């Protein structure tokens, strides 16, 4: 007798079109409207508008505000995956697409050799797709969380040591909570509250044809 393994194949048709424009209200104020159209053969069509404002009081400072809506269909993996490893992960063919409303506001600046930015973001997601533990045998299943509230602050500071060498350090504070039907909000899994990053970038400006970080 031999061993046989059945391979399952899945596919999806997903088309997206994105258009954007830049309007200059005056020398300091810029408006960026955009629109994204998506069609999924299973989940239908959606329109996601977005509007951004940028104000530049001087040549070294920019204030930015953005607001928009979003749509995200489940991926093939989220729908059908069957992964058996240290942790078993299973898809869910009954998943619904995510819809979201989000806004952010921040400031960017440059002073001499230093530069930086700070941005606050606030996202509200309906039917957030997330993998949750089942409570037995290290099994995780993708499911929809009725509502996800993801907000936080991103900050970055950099210094140009020379025309080829740049140092950058960043920090992200994340407050990510979700609520199932009939349950109180709880912190979402696998999302670090604080993330720190530091990198050194080198660019030889094509003298030798390489760059690194």
Where does each model-flagged region fall?
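Surface-exposed extracellular loop regions of Gram-negative outer-membrane beta-barrel proteins
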Residues: 8-40, 46-50, 165-170
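Short acidic, gly/pro-rich beta-turn/loop elements at beta-sheet edges
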Residues: 43-45, 61, 75, 115-117, ...
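Transmembrane beta-barrel strands of outer-membrane/channel proteins
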Residues: 1, 33-37, 65-69, 78, ...
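Outer-membrane beta-barrel signature, preferentially recognizing the C-terminal barrel domain
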Residues: 10-12, 56, 60-62, 69-125, ...
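Membrane-spanning beta-strand positions in outer-membrane beta-barrel proteins
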Residues: 24, 30, 52, 56, ...
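Gram-negative outer-membrane beta-barrel transporters
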Residues: 24-27, 31, 121-124, 143-213
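Outer-membrane beta-barrel translocator domains and adjoining extracellular loop/strand segments
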Residues: 1-5, 43-48, 77-82, 90, ...
């Amino acid at each position: 007798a031999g061993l046989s393994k059945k391979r399952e194949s899945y596919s999806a048709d997903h088309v997206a079109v994105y258009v954007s424009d830049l309007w200059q209200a005056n020398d300091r104020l810029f408006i960026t409207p955009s629109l994204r159209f998506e069609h999924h053969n299973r989940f239908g069509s959606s329109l996601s508008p977005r509007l951004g404002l940028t104000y530049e009081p001087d040549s070294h400072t920019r204030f930015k505000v953005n607001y928009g809506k979003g749509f995200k269909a489940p991926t093939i993996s989220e729908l059908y995956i069957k992964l058996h490893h240290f942790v078993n992960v299973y898809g869910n063919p009954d998943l619904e697409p995510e819809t979201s409303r989000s806004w952010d506001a921040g400031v960017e600046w440059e002073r001499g050799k230093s530069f930086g930015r700070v941005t606050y973001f606030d996202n509200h997601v309906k039917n957030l797709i997330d993998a949750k533990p089942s409570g037995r045998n290290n099994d995780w299943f993708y499911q929809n969380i009725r509502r996800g509230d993801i907000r936080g602050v991103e900050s970055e500071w950099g210094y140009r040591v020379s025309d080829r060498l740049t140092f950058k350090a960043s920090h992200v504070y994340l407050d990510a909570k979700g609520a199932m039907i009939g349950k109180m909000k709880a912190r979402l899994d696998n999302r670090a509250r604080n993330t720190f990053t530091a990198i050194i970038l080198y660019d030889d400006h094509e003298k030798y044809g390489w760059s690194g970080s």
